[in-house]
Each structure stands twice: as structure tokens, then as C-alpha cells.
Curated annotation (Swiss-Prot):
Disordered: annotated segments: 251-271, 372-414, 438-471, 624-651
Protein name per its UniProtKB record: Protein SPT21
Any GO BP annotation: regulation of transcription by RNA polymerase II
Keywords for this protein: Phosphoprotein
Biased composition regions of type Polar residues, renumbered to the chain: 626-651
Gene Ontology cellular component annotations, sorted alphabetically: chromosome, telomeric region; nucleus
Endpoints of the signal sequence: none
Biased composition (Low complexity): 395-408
PANTHER family: PROTEIN SPT21
Residues recorded as bearing Phosphoserine in the entry: 454
Function field: Required for normal transcription at a number of loci in yeast.
Length: 758
């Protein structure tokens, strides 16, 4: 048998299969529950049968408590979001407590609101609860499908409340002690179900719309909700309507009023393109564009290509400047650069250029080099032709020099003809220059104008050719005097015989050569021409002798200074010296004869005006010539000042003796010269050693030719001694001989140095 009792509700429910956890809702006021005792379905160890106390309550009361405790979990506008909940409860009367479905939450709400005849007010809560209980119990009997069963258990929280209430009674407070000791425990599960408004029929849409109309159509008194839950319901409804972004017109046939249209307060974003190409591929046409010519897709394609081209043209790229220290920044050239050769660097200059223009006549005069035509009939010769002619004349002169002395007369004629030709050539040049004195003034004016032009056209130097130096402008022309009379006879004998012979005719002030210096110093110190001077500039600091004594004797007889070691500064020069010395021998005879004749005539002329002191000097010179014929004959030439005193007979006789002595000596030498020259040539050809070698410095194995006086003295002292002849070959023979012997015979550098001192 069942009975009615008052107890509180304890509701345990889960959402989405328990993924979000379990929830608990308690009722604040006790509810009327029908309680019954049934046998327990769970078997026990003992055969004794136990009873189970259960309670039954209506589903509407349970949902109301859930809405009051957690309104955010179960929303009334779930259908607008496109989903719904299916409601299950656990039946404790069956074994294992299975879940029993009660239907969709939206359908249950519809039934509860239609069949609720009671009203809810805040003033008479107790009365309404009593009436509610009575009405619920009546409905439970009418419809048992919405009855939910649960287990009746003890209320632990009620025991705590009783202890708290007893303490409060002792303190004088009045507390309601009507708290039930038991509670009803009900277990529910809400499972989400996805719904679609478009696919559903008219009935479902109407039912859902009516469900949405529930808050507006029904008065607030008819709803079993509190004002707090009602306000929360309105806020959630507005929120979901914004998210759904749908407008629903509600037509109420009973009232005849039209609902307001809901709009989105947020503005919609602007469309970038109004038309778009299809995603599928069309067949290409003849133009291979992929779209028909008159179609909208083709127009869109062309518009897209046009916009892409404009975007590429409008893209501005920043200019990258790269400036180096050695290079100007030419990214933006404000000045135009001239490409000509002479003005390719003018853009680097900051100064302004002069804008003066030169007349073309003056420019042509400045550009043309001055030239003088010697022969007006003949065209001017080029430099190549002039060089060739000069070479031919030089070759002819050299060939004439290399001939023997027998052909000297013919060579002299040829040389004179060549020199006369050259003199005629020079005279023609001088006559042309001197005959036109007015032309020189014009040329000076042209030079001044050319200088002005060169100043105005500094920047155009490369385009103007350099002016050639004329014969008048040459510096050597001012120094040389062409009108002076040259001694062409002496010039022909000296210049055209050998290449280096003309050095002796020049003064040492002009050319300070080793040969000229050595010649002057030999005359001052009365040294042998074979001895080399101490000249650090030519690396000759030790005096050396010639290779042979016979060469020295011939040199003294011919009065020619043979090339010494001063000229032999390299192996190449030393090898070429014997060939040069061969040419000297052929040309020395004529010069020696000429010099002797000139010396004799000068002495004869001077002897008439000489003083007694001069006569003594001449006697000494004659004795020297008689004693030693190998000394140079240049000492016979005496240059004295003319005197007005009358000449004596002694001077005349002395001069006659000198001339007779010279003629006899010259006649003897003329026969011996030919043989001596041939021997010298053969000795020089055989000689292969370098003159500066020890073999040439010290004649170790060659017997030395001593003078006749020394040989006679040695024979007088040592008549039977044969070993004395070997002393001449000794290297240190200079140390044994003393006095005059050492001064006459020099076999080593030390002995030569001692002879110079004596």
C-alpha cells in the first residue's frame, strides 16, 4: 500500500553521456511524494527477503527544480541552436537500474504548459503549494507516463540542520523545526540530439514556433517560474537570436498583430568582388582563353588581367644607391657628359670653361708644324730618307778610313768632296734663312699667337699635334757659328780615320772623359802612356803596364797614346780593343810625320828670336833625343812669345843641327816601321788573355828587353856567370836592381809606383 509523505528532493543528472560531469540539484522546500515498500530485487546472502522503500513524483516538479538551480545548463531556446535533449531516468525497481526514456525535452514542455490549470503568485506560496500537490496527485493518476521513481533515503543535511536548530532554540531564537528526516533521490540523464529546422514538416515548425511563443503568449502568472528565471530566459533568448542571424515573422491569428523584424546591429563586411569565376574547367575555345568570348566569365578574366597589370606598374621599388669613394654617383646625372677624347674628364672639374672661340685661320696655322724647304724645286725629304742618306755617307767615310796609307790621297779627295757637299747643303740652308729677315718677324708673331691659342685651348690639347722644332729654333744653332772657318784638313785627318779619334781634339772642359784626363795628366807628370791612372770612377786604382815592351816602344815612336786599362772596363770592351788598335797603327804614321814637320818649322821660326836661356833648353832637349829615341817627340814643339831682338848665329846652327838629326832619325824609322807594324799585328792576334789578368800585369815567362847600357854593365861585372841572365825573368828583379835600373825597367805595380816617385 502507498502513502503520501513530505520530503525533500535530491536530483542527480548528467549532460552528454557524462562527459561534462554530473550535477546535483536540491529542493529548498519539501515536496509531497508517494512512498511504498516493495521487496528488494537485489539478492542477499541469506534467504531472508528485504524490503525497499521507494518514492514516486511527477517529472514537471523535477524539471522545475533543475531550472531553478542551473538555468544556464538547460536553455529554453535550444531548438534555435539546432539541437535538443532526450531525457532518461533510472528505474530502481528493476535489476541493474536501467535507463528509461521520457522523450524530447521540447515535447515534454509543450505538454506541461498546455495541461497546467494553476496560477503562480508570490503572495500565497503556501496555498499554491498545497493546491499544486493536490492537483499533481490527481494528474498522476490520470497520466502515469510522466511519473519518476526514486529511492527514499535518510537526509543527512536534515540531521545537521536539527543540531543547528537545537542550538538556536537555546539562544532564544525561533526556528522552523518541520524538516523531514527522509529525502527522495532521483537520477536523470540528458543526451543531446541534433535537429534541422528546414527538413522538418509544417507540424514540427508550428510546434516549435509555438514553443518559442510560450514566454510572450502566456501570462507571467501562469508560468511556474520565478521573476529571476524569467529575466535570465529573456537575456538568453536575445543572445541566441544574434548568433543565429535569422529573422522569423510570428503571425498570431488570434490577436492579428505582426511581430517586429529582428535585424543584425553589426554591419556586414563589404564584398571585394561581385562576380567570381566558376570552379570547374570549361572547354577551351579557339582563342585558348578557356572561356566563351561573350560570356561573363571571359569578361571577368579580362578584368583580372587588367588589374594585375596595373598593380605591377604601380609597384614602386626603392632605388638602391651604391656609392664608392673612388667613383662618383651617376645614378642621377644632372650634367651632360661629353664623349670626346679630350673632354671625357671635364665633368670632374668644377670651374667654368671659357667660351671664347678661336678663328679657323689661326688654328690651322698653329696646328701646322713649321718646315723649311731648302730646294724649292724638290719636295721635302722625309725623316726616313734623311736617315738613309746620312747612313750612306757615314759608311763611305768608314770604308775610306779602313784603307791603307797608300790610298790616303784618294780618300782625302773623297772626304773633301763629301765635306764640300755638306758645306754646300749648310750654306743653302743659311742663305735661305738669312735672305728672308722679314719672315722671322712673321714667325715670331705666329708663335705669340700660337701661345695665346694654347692658353685659350688648354682643354683641347690632345686634338692638336705637337709642333716640330725648326732649324732656327734649335738650341744648338745659337751655340754653333756656321760662318766660322773650320780647319777641314785637320778635321778630315782626325775625324774620319777612326770613331774615337775626335775625342783628342776637344777640350777637357766639354767632355771630362778618362782618355782626355789621362792625356793631360801624362803630359804634366811625364809618365808613360801605358800606365793607368788612379781613377776611382773607372774602378782603376792600381797602375798596370802594357802587355809588351815592343808595343810601348812603337807607341813612343809614333807619339800615339794607346788605349790603356782605363778604357778596358768590361770583358766586351777588352776583347774589342785589339781590333781598334790595328786601325791606329795605319793612321799614326801620317800624323807623326805632320807633327814633326810642324814642330821643326816652329822651332826654326822661334830660334831667330830666342834668348840664351832658350838656347840652353834646346841643347838639353837635343841631348835627350840623342840618348833616348823612344821618348815622345811632342816635347820638341816650343810655343814662345815673339821678341824683337835679333837672332844669333848660334841659334841658327843649333836649329840646323836639330833638323838634320830629325831627318836622319826619321829615315831610319821609315824602314823599320813596316816590319814593326806587321809584328805587332801578329802579336795582338795571338794574344787572347784579358789585359787586366795577372798574365798581362806580370810578364812571368817573357824575357824583358833591357837597354844596351844595362846589358853592357852586367856583362862587365859578371862575364863568366851564366845564372845572371835568369834574373831578368824573376818577378822580384826590381828589388835587386837599384837606382837607374829600377826606373828604366818596371816589372811589377810596386816597382812602377817607385819609378813614378823617382
Amino acid at each position: 500500500m502507498s502513502e503520501l509523505s513530505q520530503m525533500t528532493l535530491k536530483i542527480l543528472y548528467t549532460l552528454d553521456n557524462g562527459s561534462n560531469g554530473s550535477y546535483l540539484a536540491r529542493s529548498r522546500a519539501p515536496k509531497q511524494v508517494r512512498v511504498a515498500n516493495i521487496p528488494s530485487p537485489f539478492p542477499t546472502d541469506s534467504n531472508e527477503q528485504t524490503e525497499l522503500r521507494i518514492g514516486a513524483i511527477h517529472l514537471k516538479t523535477i524539471l522545475h527544480e533543475i531550472y531553478l538551480n542551473s538555468p544556464e545548463v538547460l536553455d529554453h531556446d535550444t531548438l534555435k541552436d539546432g539541437y535538443d535533449y532526450n531525457l532518461y531516468y533510472r528505474d530502481i525497481c528493476e535489476v541493474d537500474e536501467p535507463l528509461v526514456s521520457l522523450g524530447l525535452l521540447s515535447g515534454l514542455r509543450k505538454k506541461f504548459h498546455k495541461n497546467s490549470p494553476y496560477q503562480y503568485t508570490e503572495n500565497n506560496i503556501g496555498e499554491e503549494e498545497s493546491e499544486e500537490r493536490d492537483e499533481v496527485t490527481e494528474e498522476e493518476y490520470e497520466d502515469e507516463s510522466f511519473i519518476v521513481t526514486g529511492r527514499v533515503c535518510s537526509n543527512v543535511s536534515a540531521l545537521l540542520r536539527r543540531s543547528y536548530s537545537n542550538i538556536s532554540n537555546k539562544k532564544g531564537r525561533v526556528v522552523n523545526n518541520q524538516i523531514p528526516e527522509e529525502t527522495l533521490e532521483v537520477k536523470l540523464r540528458f543526451t543531446k540530439v541534433i535537429t534541422n529546422l528546414r527538413t522538418s514538416g509544417n507540424n514540427t515548425t508550428n510546434s516549435r514556433i509555438s514553443c518559442l511563443q510560450m514566454p510572450s503568449s502566456l501570462p507571467s502568472a501562469t508560468l511556474p517560474f520565478t521573476p529571476k528565471s524569467q529575466s535570465l530566459f529573456k537575456t538568453n533568448q536575445i543572445k541566441n537570436s544574434r548568433n543565429a542571424r535569422t529573422t522569423i515573422t510570428i503571425n498570431n491569428t488570434n490577436s492579428g498583430t505582426v511581430g517586429r523584424r529582428q535585424t543584425n546591429p553589426m554591419p556586414a563586411p563589404k564584398a571585394v568582388r561581385t562576380q567570381s569565376l566558376p570552379i570547374w574547367n570549361l572547354k577551351p575555345n579557339i582563342a585558348n582563353t578557356g572561356f566563351p568570348r561573350n560570356s561573363i566569365a571571359h569578361k571577368i578574366y579580362l578584368a583580372d588581367r587588367k588589374t594585375e597589370a596595373n598593380q605591377q606598374n604601380n609597384q614602386h621599388q626603392n632605388i638602391a644607391y651604391e656609392i664608392n669613394t673612388l667613383q662618383n654617383d651617376n645614378t642621377i646625372q644632372r650634367t651632360k657628359i661629353d664623349d670626346s677624347v679630350s673632354k671625357r674628364f671635364d665633368f670632374m672639374l668644377n670651374k667654368r670653361k671659357s667660351t671664347k672661340k678661336v678663328s679657323p685661320g689661326i688654328a690651322t696655322i698653329a696646328k701646322k708644324p713649321a718646315s723649311i724647304n731648302i730646294n724649292p724645286k724638290q719636295p721635302p725629304k722625309t725623316s726616313g730618307e734623311k736617315k738613309a742618306n746620312d747612313k750612306q755617307t757615314i759608311v763611305k767615310v768608314k770604308n775610306s778610313n779602313s784603307k791603307n796609307s797608300a790610298k790616303s790621297t784618294q780618300a782625302g779627295c773623297r772626304r773633301s768632296s763629301v765635306i764640300e757637299h755638306l758645306n754646300d747643303h749648310d750654306d743653302s740652308i743659311l742663305s735661305d734663312i738669312l735672305s728672308e729677315p722679314g719672315i722671322e718677324g712673321q714667325k715670331l708673331q705666329q708663335k705669340q699667337k700660337g701661345r695665346k691659342i694654347s692658353l685659350t685651348s688648354e682643354n683641347d690639347k690632345e686634338n692638336i699635334p705637337p709642333q716640330s722644332i725648326t732649324s732656327k729654333e734649335n738650341k744648338l744653332e745659337g751655340d754653333l757659328d756656321f760662318n766660322a772657318e773650320f780647319p777641314m784638313s785637320d778635321f778630315s785627318d782626325v775625324v774620319f780615320k777612326d770613331e774615337m779619334g775626335w775625342f783628342s781634339n776637344f777640350n777637357c772642359n766639354f767632355f771630362e772623359s778618362p782618355t782626355s784626363a789621362s792625356a793631360s795628366q801624362l803630359n804634366q807628370q811625364n809618365l808613360k802612356p801605358s800606365i793607368t791612372l788612379n781613377d776611382p770612377n773607372t774602378c782603376n786604382t792600381i797602375a798596370l803596364e802594357n802587355e809588351d815592351v815592343s808595343e810601348l816602344e812603337t807607341a813612343q815612336n809614333n807619339k800615339i797614346s794607346l788605349p790603356s786599362d782605363v778604357d778596358k772596363t768590361s770583358p766586351i770592351d777588352s776583347l774589342s780593343i785589339p781590333l781598334i788598335e790595328l786601325t791606329h797603327s795605319s793612321s799614326t804614321t801620317n800624323m807623326q810625320r805632320i807633327s814633326i814637320k810642324e814642330g821643326s818649322t816652329l822651332n826654326i821660326t822661334d830660334s831667330n828670336n830666342a834668348t840664351p836661356c832658350d838656347n840652353d833648353i834646346k841643347d838639353r832637349k837635343a841631348s835627350v833625343i840623342d840618348s833616348d829615341n823612344t821618348k815622345p817627340q811632342a816635347g820638341l814643339i816650343n810655343f814662345s812669345t815673339p821678341a824683337d831682338q835679333p837672332a844669333s848665329d848660334n841659334n841658327v846652327t843649333a836649329s840646323k843641327k836639330l833638323t838634320s838629326m830629325l831627318e836622319t832619325q826619321q829615315s831610319k824609322r821609315s824602314h823599320e816601321e813596316v816590319l814593326d807594324e806587321e809584328e805587332e799585328e801578329e802579336a795582338l792576334k795571338k794574344q787572347k788573355a784579358i789585359p787586366s789578368s795577372p798574365c798581362g800585369m806580370f810578364n812571368y815567362h817573357q824575357p824583358m828587353e833591357l837597354s844596351e847600357d844595362i846589358v853592357e854593365e852586367e856583362q862587365g861585372h859578371n862575364i863568366g856567370d851564366d845564372n845572371e841572365s835568369d834574373k831578368t825573368n824573376d818577378l822580384f828583379s826590381t828589388f835587386i836592381h837599384s837606382g837607374i835600373r829600377v826606373s828604366q825597367v818596371v816589372t811589377s805595380p810596386i816597382g812602377e809606383f817607385q819609378s813614378i816617385k823617382h
